[in-house]
Amino acid sequence: MYVSKNMDQWQAFIEILRTAFAQNKEQELLTLLLTPDERDAVGLRLQIVAQLLDKRCSQREIQQNLNTSAATITRGSNMIKTMPPEFMQWVKEQLDGQKE
């Protein structure tokens, strides 16, 4: 599984993110660190993952539903394939729980 070119920077990000969540400051931290376009891209990736895990639509339909490129859908699909199945099941449960 590919994580980051610079693991020290990635770990520093994860640690400050953990701290922000523990102190209920995640919104402010992510707003500081991510541009509006980057926040939109993260939201889009979450929608892509949700629809891919739902398995109701083809990748082409997801592309059309979300008005994005085939390459963007493929990147999401490829990343899912690199993750442990148990983790992806957990992600699906979290996403399904948000629908309720």
Give each language-model segment a name.
Residues E26-R45:
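Short, Lys/Arg-enriched anionic-surface-contact patches
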